[in-house]
């Protein structure tokens, strides 16, 4: 993340919030209620993101960020990295590689798009209901790992946040 632009970081944040429930479902339901992996949508962090959009202070955003949220931005200050806390200890290599590929695809998509265009596209999702198409555009051939029968309500909550 050290070499990433603020545009990329913002894109990662909004994409993460949109897909957060899908990530938790992939990682396993036990993680959703874990106090060391609190969903961003269940905190006041989306307000911090909105404030960042207004005031453009990355330092204040990372300072306000909660360490035990599912996506932890606090390491940005010291290490130039972000931390995804969803994945519990696991021995299934294929499962872990799938998780890594999902995150890689999210980051790759975030780097390719301008924030304002992505933001506008996300804002229309609850109107167009193009959730599955959006998942497929971001995660490509790995999208099937996130497509569930509750895709619409899971993504609606992220889009509305």
Which residues are covered by each model-predicted region?
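C-terminal accessory/tail domains of diverse enzymes
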Residues: 3-161
């Amino acid at each position: 993340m050290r070499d990433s632009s603020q545009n990329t970081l913002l894109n990662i944040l909004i994409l993460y919030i949109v897909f957060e429930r899908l990530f938790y479902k992939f990682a396993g339901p036990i993680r959703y209620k874990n106090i060391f992996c609190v969903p961003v949508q269940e905190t006041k962090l989306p307000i911090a993101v909105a404030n960042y959009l207004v005031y453009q202070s990355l330092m204040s955003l990372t300072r306000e960020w909660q360490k035990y949220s599912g996506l932890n931005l606090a390491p940005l200050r010291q290490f130039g990295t972000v931390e995804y806390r969803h994945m519990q200890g696991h021995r299934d290599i294929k499962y872990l590689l799938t998780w890594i590929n999902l995150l890689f695809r999210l980051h790759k998509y975030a780097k390719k798009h301008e924030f304002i265009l992505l933001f506008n596209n996300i804002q229309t999702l609850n109107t167009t209901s193009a959730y599955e198409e959006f998942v497929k555009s971001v995660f490509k051939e790995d999208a099937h790992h996130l497509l569930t029968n509750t895709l619409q309500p899971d993504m609606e909550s992220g889009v509305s946040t």
